[in-house]
Design a protein with these regions (language model features):
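Sec-dependent N-terminal signal peptides of Gram-positive bacterial secreted proteins and lipoproteins
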Residues: 1-22
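Acidic, metal/ion-coordinating pockets
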Residues: 17-291
């Protein structure tokens, strides 16, 4: 009987993306996780996990990273954290700003759309998992989502993207990342879309927080992964404490057997805690990583 130990190895609280170096084993299934140790008899494996918060690109950041020829370079934003994200076995970022490219027109608060160079910087910084379900995911419409996903698939296919999907078939695919023989299953959800509504028949494009869906997703993921990590876009902006809904959802996820919960959206740091599930399991909850 395999024993699984989950230990928080390194959590970064930064504004921006990151890149990586070295080889990281990836599979068509996908998953991610914090410094995780799995033990089966004398078999001990260490996997390091680094996570950062909301990568939200405001207008001033566009301005200061413009090259003057219509292109952008955001890589220097992450140069001081690359040593962490590139070294980690799995590095996670919440890509809050949708990056549908300049062809859709760049925009910032309150409705965002960024250039593809943001995604290049994320890749250069070494991220393996990009959460792409937030209240800003539909800011550039359906085309913004499709453009971002197409760019990631063509230029950065090794980065796992959760929470948004180009097709119904893709929305049903399980994502698992394998490191040191340990399979990390990953999921991501958002509380809403800032009043924007997905077209009828396209509801699959963004994973919204829905208990029935989450339960079904987690149950399927547990069959093909050793560790389950869920990204949750939730909470109250600029509040340093989790609200009751966050706590209730954390308990719900723990009861399902989820191992790690990564929270975003408040734009400030909130506490970390362990929640005990109904079967006595312990779930590490990071309520908010800030920006």
């Amino acid at each position: 009987m395999k024993k699984l130990w989950i230990v928080l190895g390194c959590v970064l609280l930064v504004t921006g993306c990151s890149g990586k170096s070295g080889t990281k084993e990836t599979k068509q299934e996908k998953a991610a996780d914090p410094v995780v140790k799995t033990e089966e008899k004398d078999d001990i494996r260490d996997v390091s996990f680094v996570a950062v918060g909301d990568n939200l690109i405001h207008g001033a950041i566009f301005y200061y990273n413009a090259k003057g020829d219509g292109t952008y370079d955001f890589k220097d934003i992450y140069e001081h954290t690359n040593r962490y994200t590139r070294k980690a076995d799995i590095a996670y970022i919440n890509q809050e700003t949708i990056c549908g490219g300049t062809e859709l027109g760049l925009s910032h608060y309150p409705s965002f759309n960024g250039p593809y160079e943001v995604l290049d910087a994320v890749a250069d910084a070494g991220f393996d998992w990009m959460a792409a379900s937030s209240n800003h995911t539909l800011d550039a419409g359906v085309q913004g989502i499709l453009n971002q996903l197409a760019y990631m698939k063509e230029h950065h296919p090794d980065i796992r993207v959760t929470g948004s999907h180009a097709t119904r078939e893709e929305s049903e695919q399980l994502q698992v990342i394998t490191r040191e023989g340990v399979k990390f299953g990953i999921l991501g959800y958002t509380y809403g879309l800032n009043g924007y509504v997905l077209p009828k028949g396209k509801e699959y494009m963004v994973d919204l927080i829905d208990k029935d869906k989450i339960k079904n997703d987690v149950e399927k993921l547990k069959k093909v992964s050793d560790v389950q990590i869920v990204s949750m876009h939730w909470g109250t902006e600029y509040s340093f404490e989790p609200n009751e809904e966050q706590k209730e959802l954390a308990q719900f996820l723990s009861d399902l057997g989820v191992d790690v919960i990564i929270g975003e959206h408040p734009h400030v740091i909130q506490p970390m805690d362990y929640v005990t599930g109904k079967d006595g399991n312990q779930t590490l909850v990071i309520y908010s990583l800030g920006n």
